[in-house]
Every structure is written in structure tokens, then in C-alpha cells.
Amino acid sequence: MSKTHLTEQKFSDFALHPVVVQALEKKGFYNCTPIQALALPLTLAGRDVAGQAQTGTGKTMAFLTSTFHYLLSHPAAENRQVNQPRALIMAPTRELAVQIHSDAEPLAEATGIKLGLAYGGDGYDKQLKVLESGVDILIGTTGRLIDYTKQNHVNLGAIQVVVLDEADRMYDLGFIKDIRWLFRRMPAATERLNMLFSATLSYRVRELAFEQMNNAEYVEVEPEQKTGHRIKEELFYPSNEEKMRLLQTLIEEEWPDRAIIFANTKHRCEDIWGHLAADGHRVGLLTGDVAQKKRLRILDEFTRGDLDILVATDVAARGLHIPAVTHVFNYDLPDDCEDYVHRIGRTGRAGASGHSISLACEEYALNLPAIETYIGHSIPVSKYNPDALLSELPPPKRLSRPRTGNGPRRSGAPRNRRRTG
């Protein structure tokens, strides 16, 4: 994490449980990010927090630190049953739930607090086996949480801490009824610590906070700035016929260390993946059709640097902290203005600079005015020479083979091809 992204406030300055501070410092966390410095004084005082912060600002560690401190500082109910977790952390996607669980593991190891994970797709019996042994903090997606609760594998009657992460995304994915169902089975809001985090504190998110929290305090990090000032934005107007060649040319010119390419449909993502894999790039595909285990493996490979490019639908645009993404390509301009902000928010994180390149083609250029109105500025336009685009590119690979993840490794030697003109 860049030092420019940190405040002068140290975790050790707060009255945090000493074991929590030691665990944080062991992981190299000494100074707070802005959202942590704003949220911790409130949660340590037992006050509910609704925070506006993008992914990558340290919000996960803000609510994890608060949760572990609270559980260590407040005894569990004497009559608590083995199927009753003490804290519940709800996430909109299984990838985010897995990531939060991973971030919580060092704190759990240091404190002896037990973690559980519940998400759909696979691993039902494996997850259930952990729950049956008893967990203190349960992290999961709403569908699987409801499933376990209805079967009495989980009872929410002893919940002391609740976290709702990416609340706006919960609405986008239609999970709000599930959230309310789960809240109705918990103790009253006044009897627990409640935290909500969202990229935007829209009216509907504030309404949820009013309904389910106890006079929540609102904290915001740079609320006036919808796109990071460290992100260089750039816009091209390609024809539909030249769009793919322009993308491949830009990748050759930029040669990004780590890039994410977003498209609006899974079929478009598969097409992009096929062209880039055939062209020799180390590229992974992340859509809803990719099996859960493979999605997690691809994310891990991309995070480790074994893949240079990830092609994704908006399933990956929210909540996933992938460090050091240098470039984001919007192959399609998104239909939802907020998705533009969330997509380009993959880069320029934690004090680093980033580059966002958008292609406004004939099909999606109509989305541009609403996006620019939403972000409050025009995206700088760049021009390209059609005669300078790459040509003689290989035909795209197809997804007939099981391996969805990677194309061939990049070679340091240039391929024998030429630009036209």
C-alpha cells in the first residue's frame, strides 16, 4: 500500500484489543487509510457506521478490525448454541466472500476466533462441516446463508456484529429481500454493532441503513470525486469492424503489466479472450459461466501475475481487490453509469496511478452522455490511424477445450507480423 494513501493515524493509537493490533502489525499494517481512520473511532465507541468507500481503500480491514475487536471485548451469550455465529458478514458475490475470509484469516489465527464461509456454487458439504463444528464469524452470500438458516444449520439469534459489504451491489443483483429476511432473524439493531459499506451512499442504501441499523453515522472518503484523480482516462471512437484490432493494437502499444478488459456480455468476453489467447497473451476469462473453482483459480493466477490480462463481465467489477492493476479497458461502454466508475476503480488504487481506456463503438456510444454526466466531466478523446492498426492476426481460439484460463505464455521475442500502412 502506497504511503501516500495512508494517514498519520496509527492502529496502535486506538484503544484496540492488543492482540488485534499485534496481528495487524505482523501483516505490515501500522497506519490507517482514510476510511479506517474515520470508521474506527465510531465502531470502537459502539456506534454503527455506514461508509462510502471504493474497493481498495481499506474498508475490508476497517470492518474486520472492528469485528474482531468487538468480539474480543464483548462476551458471547451464555446460552449460545453451536449453530449460532456471533458475527455475520454479507457479501454480494462468492468471490468477495472468499476474499474477505482470506483477509480475516491472519486475525483469526492470532485471536483464536473461528471463521466460517458460506457461498453458493459448490462446496456445500465442506462448508457445512465447518459450520457444524461452530464458528464465531460467518462470511457468506445471502442465498447460501438463507439455505443453511432454513435448515437450522445456522441460527442468527446470537449475532453481535453485522457487516453488509457492497450494499449498492446487493440492490443491483436483487438480493435486498434476502438481506431483509436475514435481518429479521437477528437480535434488534440496538443489541448489535452494525456496519455497512458501499461505493455509493444512494437513497436506497441510506434507506436500508435507516431500516436495519441503529442511528448509523455516515462517513465518506472523497465523496465529491467519482473517478480517482490518479486514473488517466482516454476514449476512442472505433467502428465496429475496427474495434477488436484497435484493442489489440492498444495492448501492443501499452504492453500493460496487468490489465482487465470489461465487456457487457459473456459472449463478447469469450470472443475477446479467443483473439488475445490466439495472439499469444497470457489471458484469463471470468464470466458467470466459468465454474466456481476455475474462477477462483483464474483470479489467483491473475493476482500472482501468472496471467497478464483478465477479460471479465461486471461480475468481477465489484468488490474484488486485485492489487497493482495498471490498465482497465472498457471494450464496451457499460449500460449502467455506476459500473463505469466501478470498472475503472480496478486501477489507480492505494496511491498508485492507473490508465483507463474506453472504446465508444457504434453499439454502445449512446451510453457515453449519461456516463459523463454521472462522473461530472468529459472523458478525453484520442484518435487513431486506421492504417496503423495491427493486421495479419491469427484467428481466435474457441472455448471447446476445457482450459478456459490461459493462453500461451508471452514470449519476449516479437512475432512476425506487421502494421498496415
UniProtKB/Swiss-Prot annotation:
InterPro entries for the chain: DEAD/DEAH_box_helicase_dom (IPR011545), DEAD_box_RNA_helicase (IPR050079), Helicase_ATP-bd (IPR014001), Helicase_C-like (IPR001650), P-loop_NTPase (IPR027417), RNA-helicase_DEAD-box_CS (IPR000629), RNA_helicase_ATP-dep_RhlB (IPR023554), RNA_helicase_DEAD_Q_motif (IPR014014)
Keyword Metal-binding: no
Main location: cytoplasm
Amino acid composition bias (Low complexity), ranges on this chain: 405-414
PROSITE patterns membership: DEAD_ATP_HELICASE, HELICASE_ATP_BIND_1, HELICASE_CTER, Q_MOTIF
Gene3D superfamilies: P-loop containing nucleotide triphosphate hydrolases
UniProt domain Helicase ATP-binding: residue ranges: 40-219
Highest rank taxon of the organism: Bacteria
Domain Helicase C-terminal, first and last residues per copy: 245-390
Subcellular location per the Swiss-Prot or TrEMBL entry: Cytoplasm
UniProt keyword terms in alphabetical order: ATP-binding, Cytoplasm, Helicase, Hydrolase, Nucleotide-binding, RNA-binding
SUPFAM superfamilies (UniProt xref): P-loop containing nucleoside triphosphate hydrolases
Glycosyltransferase recorded as keyword: no
Substrates-to-products reaction catalysed: ATP + H2O = ADP + phosphate + H(+)
Enzyme Commission (EC) number: 3.6.4.13
GO cellular component, one term: cytosol
Job of this protein: DEAD-box RNA helicase involved in RNA degradation. Has RNA-dependent ATPase activity and unwinds double-stranded RNA.
The protein's assembly and partners: Component of the RNA degradosome, which is a multiprotein complex involved in RNA processing and mRNA degradation.
Protein name: ATP-dependent RNA helicase RhlB
Organism of derivation: Cronobacter sakazakii (strain ATCC BAA-894) (Enterobacter sakazakii)
